[in-house]
């Protein structure tokens, strides 16, 4: 027995039902229009009236995810725009959904690019670490869990026993007791600490790890 329509529900005629798979949009469909779409998105996100529009930032994230390696031709432009937005938002991080999609967009770029070309790892570090450092020093609590996750992934992508000096300098910051007092930081901190132990345990971790646990 067919289901009874709910009030105000409009059901299509049987002859008008269309296979939804016919309309599935693929990466190939998106690539020719990607640049135009990004230009439109960032025109909104750089406008003084709508620069923290969470729906547009979500669209950036979803388009970037759908494009996968098709995103590479736009990589430099996207990182420049996203870093600019990150710098601006870090001064007043009062839009949690927007912030989430912003960091998700950055993460998609990193994961896709490093998977296709490991040499881009250093480029991301050069661009992002100068932004991440003041987030730590200014204790921007809303951003720290996201930053820790991204740094953890970047560090995990390095060969064991070989990490840049920037990570060594940062290690001192992640041992800050206040970071560990916030439950929201713990998962990302734990993963990042594990990455430090795996990649450079003998050189920078062993003698300093006791600081986390010896807090009398």
Language-model-detected regions and their locations in the chain:
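Karyopherin-beta/Importin-beta family HEAT-repeat alpha-solenoid scaffold
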Residues: 1-216
């Amino acid at each position: 027995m067919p289901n009874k329509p709910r009030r105000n529900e409009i059901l299509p005629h049987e002859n008008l039902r269309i296979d939804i798979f016919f309309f599935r949009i693929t990466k190939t469909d998106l690539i020719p229009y990607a640049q135009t779409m990004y230009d439109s998105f960032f025109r909104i996100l750089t406008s003084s009236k709508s620069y923290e529009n969470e729906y547009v930032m979500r669209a950036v994230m979803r388009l970037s995810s759908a494009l996968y390696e098709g995103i590479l031709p736009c990589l430099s432009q996207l990182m420049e725009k996203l870093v600019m937005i990150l710098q601006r938002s870090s001064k007043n991080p009062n839009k949690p959904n927007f912030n989430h999609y912003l960091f998700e967009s950055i993460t998609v770029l990193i994961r896709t690019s490093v998977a296709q070309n490991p040499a881009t790892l250093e480029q991301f570090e050069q661009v992002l670490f100068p932004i991440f450092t003041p987030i730590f020093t200014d204790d921007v609590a809303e951003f720290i869990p996201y930053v820790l996750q991204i740094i953890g992934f970047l560090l995990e992508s390095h060969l064991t026993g070989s990490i840049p000096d920037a990570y060594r300098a940062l290690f001192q910051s992640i041992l800050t007791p206040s970071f560990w007092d916030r439950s929201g930081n713990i998962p990302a901190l734990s993963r990042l600490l594990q990455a430090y132990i795996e990649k450079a345990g003998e050189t920078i971790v062993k003698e300093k790890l006791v600081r986390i646990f010896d807090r009398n």
